[in-house]
């Protein structure tokens, strides 16, 4: 208490941007009404999502269903001077360029997708170094493209058809793959027989797991439910794609096991079946991440798999206009790479309800997150810790996004990221994880996005103790799970949804016992309690079966049991996998 006469004064504490300390408290932690300008309010996307997996035996309803997120791992191989090099130095058996993606790709992205989200990245996500691209303009190259037409439904190319063309040489900056070819289209039908089809059958270079990407054109009369089926070693998996958005880029469907060579068990089929009158379009289909293609002067390509390269080069491969990926006109790939991550997000999301003031591909991305590791060290071997970053004013000083949402929504997001991460890592690893700061500063990755965004400096790649944790797969899982939970919490709260369900932890004591007659195997398991998340309670289990050299199937629900019987045949090798979800199965509508 201050003495008189100062005890009658009201004291206000502000930061250097004039924001009061009360305003720095995230909405979710407030006991009052909060700042409504940081919430989406009536702004929401209620349409068909960009892509849906129709073969899953369950449907998410209390997670991130139909939410579109833009996520990326920090840096990658880039060209500077006259050499290709990493953007960050070698330290403790790695470099940041390699380290951050070892958390984002195998852990964070699957967690978000398992919760129902559609996740996109400005960098290649597939570790597969082989690649097969099948396209209508070169129907016999790297596989086979075949069309089947029906009466009243003939595949054609429009007069203004501009689409993908597989490059026959390395990619110079002047090569625009999605502006060099054509696409095909056909009228839709509501009947389910005698369908027109387009089939892409690749010549798979080597047996293994390949990401499958499709591309198409978005026309004024495109439909929101184009039907694709991926045939793979585990059977077939069906998808619907909303072709009203996202034309002329790569859309990730999933990663599947394929046998080397060409066969009907390895292909993608698109039909003209739809519940809507209009057209479906067909363009290139890509199998696998592949190797670097971008060439630089006398130095050739980077020589690394595409997933190790910077976003600047993938953006060109993914159809971004050269004015957005080549912003320095070939003079500074590093600066291009910093800008292109946000440029790609804004281009893809432009024209959607969340980015109504920019032209683009109308994909309703509503959140962006860049995951980095930081520099800095302590000589006493203590933890250096985590840092989050946001930007509450853009380059012109605007405090609101084009949608009308306050940029302080990003402040809330970055605050929740660092708060939750500190609490989760401290609890799980029984230490005091260091919460550094939540910066509101001018960084391209948080200044340029047209939707709420943050940078998370997860830990220091320069600090020995941090890296003892950073190389631990359990730590990577725990860190990614904390980020997933924060995104789940933040995205729902922004739309006024205060209840959500966290996906459960993996089961333990998973066992298999053969029956006496050898015709069945008894699977049993125990659920794992998550002391940090009361909603992460298993409600249903899905069993996946792999027979012989095939891949896992699409799964079968066994309800909320802790044991089940699986029928088997003699002289066959089986592999069985189990996942659980925290919501009971609901039929697809």
What are these regions (language model features)?
Residues 196-220:
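A short beta-strand element within beta-rich, extracytoplasmic domains
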Residues 579-589:
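Residue-level detector of conserved catalytic or cofactor/ligand-binding positions
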Residues 72, 308-408, 439-462:
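Active-site microenvironments of hydrolase-like enzyme catalytic domains
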Residues 188, 267, 273, 284-290, ...:
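Active-site-adjacent mobile loop/cap segments within catalytic or ligand-binding domains
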Residues 233-262:
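Extracellular carbohydrate recognition and processing domains
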Residues 1-75, 80-85, 283-300, 304:
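Non-catalytic propeptide/linker segments at domain boundaries
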Residues 536-571:
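Recognizes extended acidic, P/S/T-rich segments that occur
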């Amino acid at each position: 208490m201050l003495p008189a006469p100062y005890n009658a004064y009201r004291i206000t504490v502000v930061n250097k941007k004039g924001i009061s300390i009360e305003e720095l408290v995230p909405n979710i932690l407030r006991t009052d009404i909060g700042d409504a300008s940081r919430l989406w309010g009536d702004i929401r996307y209620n349409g068909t999502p960009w892509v849906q997996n129709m073969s899953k035996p369950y449907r998410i309803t209390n997670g991130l269903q139909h939410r579109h997120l833009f996520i990326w791992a920090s840096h990658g191989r880039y060209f500077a001077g006259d050499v290709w090099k990493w953007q960050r130095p070698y330290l403790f058996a790695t470099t940041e360029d390699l380290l951050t993606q070892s958390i984002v790709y195998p852990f964070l992205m699957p967690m978000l997708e398992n919760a129902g989200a559609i996740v996109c990245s400005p960098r290649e996500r597939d570790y597969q170094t082989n690649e097969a691209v099948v396209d209508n303009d070169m129907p016999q190259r790297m596989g086979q493209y075949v069309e089947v037409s029906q009466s009243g439904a003939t595949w054609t190319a429009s007069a203004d058809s501009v689409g993908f063309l597989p490059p026959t040489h390395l990619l110079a900056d002047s090569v625009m793959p999605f502006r060099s070819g054509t696409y095909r289209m056909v009228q839709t039908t509501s009947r389910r027989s005698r369908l027109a089809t387009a089939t892409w059958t690749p010549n798979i270079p080597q047996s293994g797991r390949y990401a499958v990407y499709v591309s198409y054109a978005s026309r004024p009369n495109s439909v929101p439910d184009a039907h694709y089926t991926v045939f793979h070693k585990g059977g077939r998996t069906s998808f619907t794609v909303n072709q009203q958005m996202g034309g002329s880029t790569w859309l990730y469907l999933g990663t599947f096991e394929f046998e080397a060579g060409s066969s009907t068990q390895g292909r993608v089929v698109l039909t003209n079946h739809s519940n809507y009158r209009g057209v479906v379009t067909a363009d290139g289909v890509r199998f696998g991440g592949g190797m670097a293609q971008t060439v630089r002067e006398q130095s050739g390509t980077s020589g690394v798999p595409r997933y190790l390269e910077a976003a600047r080069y993938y953006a060109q491969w993914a159809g971004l206009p050269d004015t957005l990926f080549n912003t320095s006109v070939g003079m500074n790939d590093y600066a291009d790479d910093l800008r292109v991550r946000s440029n790609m997000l804004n281009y893809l999301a432009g024209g959607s309800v969340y980015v109504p003031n920019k032209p683009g591909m109308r994909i309703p991305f509503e959140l962006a997150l860049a995951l980095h590791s930081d520099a800095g060290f302590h000589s006493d071997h203590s933890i250096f810790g985590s840092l989050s970053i946001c930007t509450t004013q853009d380059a012109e000083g605007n405090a609101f996004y084009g949608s009308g949402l306050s940029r302080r929504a990003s402040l809330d997001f970055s605050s929740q990221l660092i708060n939750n991460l500190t609490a989760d890592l401290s609890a799980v690893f029984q230490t005091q994880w260091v919460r550094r700061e939540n910066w509101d500063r001018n960084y391209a990755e948080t200044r340029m996005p047209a939707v709420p965004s943050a940078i998370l400096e997860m830990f220091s790649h320069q600090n020995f103790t941090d890296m003892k944790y950073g190389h631990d797969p359990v730590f990577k899982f725990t860190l990614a799970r904390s980020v997933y939970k924060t995104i789940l919490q933040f995205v729902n709260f922004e739309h006024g949804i205060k209840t959500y369900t966290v996906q459960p932890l993996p089961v333990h004591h998973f066992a298999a016992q053969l029956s006496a007659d050898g015709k069945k195997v008894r699977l049993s398991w125990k659920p794992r309690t998550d002391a940090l998340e009361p909603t992460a309670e298993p409600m249903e289990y899905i069993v996946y079966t792999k027979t012989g050299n095939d891949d896992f199937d699409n799964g079968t629900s066994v309800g909320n049991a802790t044991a089940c019987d699986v029928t088997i045949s003699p002289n066959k090798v089986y592999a069985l996998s189990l996942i659980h979800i925290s919501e009971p199965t609901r039929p697809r509508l």
